[in-house]
From Swiss-Prot:
Any one Pfam family match given in the protein's UniProt record, by short name: Ribosomal_S6
UniProt KW Hydrolase keyword: no
Family according to the record: Belongs to the bacterial ribosomal protein bS6 family.
Annotated source species: Pelotomaculum thermopropionicum (strain DSM 13744 / JCM 10971 / SI)
Keyword RNA-binding: yes
One example of a Gene Ontology biological process annotation: translation
Protein name according to UniProt: Small ribosomal subunit protein bS6
UniProt entry keywords in alphabetical sequence: Ribonucleoprotein, Ribosomal protein, RNA-binding, rRNA-binding
Amino acid sequence: MRKYEVIFILRPDLEEEKNAEVIEKFKNLIESHGGEIIKIDKWGKRRLAYEVKDFREGFYIVIQINAEPKLAAELDRVFKITDEVLRHMIVRENE
């Protein structure tokens, strides 16, 4: 297993319950594919460096996980088709 840092930005117009729903969706996806969640950080609403999909702010989430490379690819695929996610990035951390 490799260590990854998953960062994603949710739309700022979502309600708190919807944010929690989306986070839970990705948490369940990670665990169902054999990944291990180390830590979840909610940075809250922050200003974006530039406009993304007509939004100037976003709700930042950072998740540290241990996972196989196949899971990272699956997460990337699901992030791309999830409307609530403005941007995402998956980075492999050095051991």
